[in-house]
């Protein structure tokens, strides 16, 4: 379907008949090599089977969604999500479940449209603050430099797999040949006051050795209704490596909000 002017790959998984809860979850994937497949292969089917309508889509420039040369600020991603929900007729609040950059998008959407968000589950994510922008600039600059070298793909295949090499090739094409690396850190960024003003319930799921290992409680200490779950011995790839536990956390969380 066309979303905010772009051909967008959207997948709907309706709640299983007989157990419909009336709740809707929107899955927001991460940046780079990620796509809606990461949720389709982990959370989408069991969440729909539990009676929750599930919406997944490839973010602009990712997966099967159209890839413009420019237009990758967080404001662009927020506008895409808002248009998608409007086109689907979803005016009631939804649960946003975001992995990595998808969680960052969820926070920005909740700040811009608080009446449309019932709750947030963020997996290895943080809001788009100045600190986040500095971190993202470093990560993206390093990624561009790494993927610009041919030997990097040999290293990826040797240490992971040929499949990971193909994913890295696609990510390199996206990052090097669009403005995404320059646009994303621009925000618009949220002040700490704006983060504190996000009033919906938030569940932050982190790996103890993940991207927020320097201060695991920094985010939830700002949020008026924030809760934290930490997986010991886990890095950034929480969704893929701990998907069964994440599934139970998400299902329990949504059931609590609906009670």
Named regions from a protein language model:
Residues 6-64:
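Conserved HGGG/HGGXW glycine-rich cap/lid loop of the alpha/beta-hydrolase fold
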Residues 98, 102, 106:
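Gly/Ala-rich beta-loop-alpha elbow adjacent to hydrolase catalytic centers
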Residues 234-243, 247:
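Catalytic histidine-centered segment of alpha/beta-hydrolase-like enzymes
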Residues 107-111, 118-148:
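Flexible "cap/lid" loop of the alpha/beta hydrolase fold
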Residues 164-194, 208-209:
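Hydrophobic, aromatic-rich cap/lid helix
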Residues 49, 53-97, 248:
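Active-site loop/oxyanion-hole signature of alpha/beta-hydrolase fold enzymes
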Residues 27-31, 100, 207:
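Glycine-rich His-Gly loop
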């Amino acid at each position: 379907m066309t979303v905010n002017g772009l051909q967008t790959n959207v997948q709907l998984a309706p709640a299983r008949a007989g157990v419909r809860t009336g709740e809707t979850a929107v899955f927001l994937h991460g940046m780079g090599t990620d796509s809606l497949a990461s949720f389709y292969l982990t959370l989408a089917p069991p969440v729909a089977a539990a009676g929750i309508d599930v919406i997944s889509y490839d973010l602009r420039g990712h997966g099967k969604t159209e890839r413009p040369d420019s237009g990758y600020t967080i404001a662009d991603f927020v506008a895409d999500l808002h248009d998608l929900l409007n086109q689907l007729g979803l005016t009631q609040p939804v649960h946003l479940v975001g992995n990595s950059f998808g969680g960052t998008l969820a926070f920005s959407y909740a700040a811009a449209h608080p009446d449309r968000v019932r709750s947030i589950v963020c997996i290895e994510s943080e809001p788009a603050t100045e600190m986040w922008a500095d971190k993202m600039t470093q990560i993206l600059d390093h990624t561009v430099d790494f993927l610009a070298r041919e030997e990097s793909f040999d290293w990826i295949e040797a240490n992971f797999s040929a499949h990971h090499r193909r994913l890295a090739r696609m990510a390199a094409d996206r990052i090097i040949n669009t403005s995404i690396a320059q646009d994303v850190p621009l925000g618009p960024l949220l002040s700490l006051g704006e983060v504190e003003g996000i009033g919906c319930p938030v569940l932050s799921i982190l790996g103890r050795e993940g991207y927020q290992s320097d201060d695991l409680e920094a985010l939830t200490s700002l949020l008026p209704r924030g809760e934290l779950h930490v997986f010991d011995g886990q890095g950034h790839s929480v969704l893929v490596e701990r998907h069964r536990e994440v599934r139970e956390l998400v299902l329990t969380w949504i059931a609590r909000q609906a009670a």
